[in-house]
Amino acid sequence: MCGIVGAVAQRDVAEILVEGLRRLEYRGYDSAGVAVVDSQSNLTRIRRLGKVQELADAVDQAEVVGGTGIAHTRWATHGEPSEINAHPHQSGDISVVHNGIIENHETLRELLQSRGYVFESQTDTEVIAHLVEWELRTAASLLEAVQKTVKQLEGAYGTVVLDRNDPSRIVVARSGSPIVIGFGVGENFLASDQLALLNVTRRFMYLEEGDVAEITRREVAVYDASGERVEREIAESNAEHDAGDKGQYRHFMQKEIYEQPTALINTMEGRITADSVVTEAIGVNAAEILSKVEHVQIVACGTSYNAGMTARYWFEDIAGVSCDVEIASEFRYRKFVTRPNSLLITLSQSGETADTLAALRLAKEKGYMAAMTICNVAGSSLVRESDFAFMTRAGVEIGVASTKAFTTQLAALLMLVTALGKQQGRISKEKEKEIVEALHALPKQINAALSFEKDIEALATDFADKHHTLFLGRGEFYPIAMEASLKLKEISYIHAEAYAAGELKHGPLALIDADMPVVVVAPSNDLLEKLKSNVEEVRARGGLLYVFADADAGFEGDETMKIITMPHVSEITAAIYYTIPMQLLSYYVALIKGTDVDQPRNLAKAVTVE
């Protein structure tokens, strides 16, 4: 993985390909490359280790021409980051780019070596190039050669193949890794993310599992896994064309932190009235399904898992329905027991997270009453394969460290919890109104919280030279502490851990000293007094405390305990609200340290491999 772009056009496509890669930089990568062929079958391949700009400079210098091409940004999975491991890979006249992991690549490599093929790279992708080259010797067309090749592959792939001897077409295959086709006028495109193509088209088609497509300037022909030609829906995208522009902000992450009030308003629009949740707006047949739910199983990864952990408290406290939350990569390999009338909920910003998708597909075989997804990308695999989808409307999120996707997931989950309790008669009209009013107030409250930016920036200097940080919370604020620790480690590279505050005495207290910052999330709720006792445990051992506390919480600071006073907000939405200062803290610590905030090392935005 990480990003794919392709084009078949009458005009030169090198600039389109490179611009597409720029738009996919947010996904994370270590190298980039293009292969372009002209009408005379002259092929140019250029690969570079490092940023897309280095590739762009090389393409400009080489004056690359040609109307058919493929391009790729790589995030290393097999083989170290290097120019020789960068895509496109070649075998004779065949060029290939690929996202995913070919699990049987070692067996295929041995087979191909026995046929006389010599491998130049350490990647699993090169086996695809050699297999296509081999199959093309006897196949009637490139399409047939690719169809024969993919039947030999085990694992996940979104792969695009170009034959220099047939510059009029490219062939793409998809299994477990997303591919979207863009339709132009006398030209067609493909990518792993529609954002790459928004500057050239607004009409898109998503390939389904097992599809193989042949793309020319005039036509897109799609074939399913059985080889039958099929039609796939073409839809107009309303995604923002300029989503890749930072505007006045220094980083995309900063921009996206500030976009949260608007993202929340958009997510709530049409789903809540002045005093109630509109259950029908949650999804097709949502009211009927929710009325029967006896158990909720949430499956997610990373930040989305933390959102699910927060919502578990809401499902049980507000709706009175038991809820389990599991990391997708663990869920799919566990021999779990499906409870009666259990609703599966997957959470994902991209809708393409490989482990979450695999968990959904497994769950469909295990007797869940329905599968729902809460997702930010319309047309993504999770949305298409779930029984119903609740879209978060956060807008395109570029920064690898998720911000607005997290808070909009929480808002969506709170609306879902309220609808569930309402359908089952477990919450009163008064309680529903209280929740809805708290949600309506939230965007304005978050706008106010963003005004603390300068204070938090000053606070961040205390963390920049530290190697470890501890985050503490209780109840639904324990997952908020988990999310805060994840953000800090992701973008500042400071080792950070989160604990339920009551667990301090069971081990983490051994870590406390004057060099260990301890961040405490302390709203005013029925666990506050317990939390104060935990704070005193740290204080008694010389720990350095930073307490984000409700104005009514009654904390008093001193030289070892700094109090960051937060305005009082509803207990119902406080978990969402307290996320904002945690995001700002992580951002400014990373800024002071000089790390790559938007593209932290070793990480990718959409994890489409296991």
Curated annotation (Swiss-Prot):
It catalyses: D-fructose 6-phosphate + L-glutamine = D-glucosamine 6-phosphate + L-glutamate. Its EC number is 2.6.1.16. The keyword Protease does not apply. The keyword Transferase applies. GO terms for biological process: carbohydrate metabolic process; fructose 6-phosphate metabolic process; protein N-linked glycosylation; UDP-N-acetylglucosamine metabolic process. PROSITE patterns: GATASE_TYPE_2, SIS. Keywords: Aminotransferase, Cytoplasm, Glutamine amidotransferase, Repeat, Transferase. Gene3D superfamilies: Glucose-6-phosphate isomerase like protein, domain 1, Glutamine Phosphoribosylpyrophosphate, subunit 1, domain 1. It comes from the Bacteria. Residues 286-426, 459-600 form the SIS domain. Signal peptide: none annotated. GO terms for molecular function: carbohydrate derivative binding; glutamine-fructose-6-phosphate transaminase (isomerizing) activity. The active site is at 2 (nucleophile), 605 (for fru-6p isomerization activity). It is found in: Cytoplasm. One of its GO terms (cellular component) is cytosol. Catalyzes the first step in hexosamine metabolism, converting fructose-6P into glucosamine-6P using glutamine as a nitrogen source. Homodimer. This is Glutamine--fructose-6-phosphate aminotransferase [isomerizing]. It comes from Vibrio vulnificus (strain CMCP6). The gene is glmS.
